[in-house]
Every structure is written in C-alpha cells, then in structure tokens.
Amino acid sequence: MCNMRNRYSLFLVLIIIFLSSLSTVCARTFEGSINFVRETVFDTTRINIYVKDSMVRVDERDTKNRLVSSHIVNLDKEEVYALSYSKELYKKLLVSSYSNDNGRISVKKTQNSKEINGHTCSQWRVRDERMNTEVAYWMCDGEFEFFSKLLNLLRRTEYSLAIFGAIPEVGGFIPMLTEERTLLRKEKLKIRIVDIEYNNPSSSLFGIPSHFKSVNRLS
C-alpha cells in the first residue's frame, strides 16, 4: 500500500512538472529584433523593432540609413516615449482612450497562402472605401503577441506605424508582407519583413539616456 501511495505521489509530481513546463512554453513570446523595409515609388526606408519582455523600441531610418525617429514603448504600463538623438531630447506621448475606428473598413481573411522567408502566410485583405485603398497583409502566425498590443497602443498616440494601423485584432500574427493599392489596383507602397532575429536585446536599448532632457514637443 505504501509503495502504491509513493508511486501515486511521484506520478502527481511528474504531472505537475509537465504542466508547469508546458505552461511556460505556451506563455513564451517573441524576444529579439524584426527589420522591415518600406518601399514607395519615391523612396525606401527601414523600420527596426526590438522586443524584450514588455518593452519595445521602434526605429525608423531614411534612404541613407539615418535615424529619422525613435520610440520606446512599455506595453504593460501603456507608455510611449519619442526620442530625438540629434537634439538629446525626449517627450512622453499622450495615450488617448481606446476608440475603435474599424467600422469604416472591411476585412476579408482569404484562403490564399504563400511562403515568405520560410514562413507560411495567409492573406488578409483590408478595404477602406473612404481612403480609396485596399491593403493585402500576408500574415504569419506565431508568438508575436506583442505586435497586436503595440499597434493598439500606438494608434492611440500622435505617432503610429501608418499602414499597419488598419490591421484589425491580430493576436499572435504579424504581416510578413504588406501591399497597399488604390481601389483601381495601382500600387502605393509595400512593406516587407527582411529579417527576424531571436535573441536577447540589451536592456540599454529600452532606456532613455540620462543626459536627455524632457520637453513638451520635439520639433
């Protein structure tokens, strides 16, 4: 009887360990960097996103790879800071109450799929009659929960990632390729992910340099 109790206790311990490890794996979210290229008929720019825990940094660079804007986001605290490295200044952006403006757009999750950079992607088409645009998002399902939170937060500030703002609730998806066209099918812009790196970014990326001064406006 004692042996049976011991075996049963051991079995319970093993089950608990298994469930704990399973829950850790399931809760795991992306950490690392994601690099986008934004192409229009006029120029090509880059968007670099760094993720560590609940912190996100978004850098935008111009055609000559010069830093145009830099933002640090705390997803848990819902805080967004804009930084100017040339002026050594920073500003905390106002985050407004959530408002859902998706009533003006229609979303169709099509059956189309294709492989992009080794990832199988599904096509979501978002149509906005008022803006005379249709955007095709080739969405990759993964551990990118931060992306939905980031978009929902940024669209409530004066800064946004522009075309990504039209994406509805995306869960763990991220667009590997974004194609915007007019309703007459004329291409306006294209944004594609060129690199995804799983790593542990330095915490210094998500801090505001101590010598930067706080201001009400950066321009």
Question: What positions do the PLM features span?
Answer:
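Extended soluble regions of mature proteins
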Residues: 27-219
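Bacterial N-terminal signal peptides that target proteins for export
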Residues: 2-12
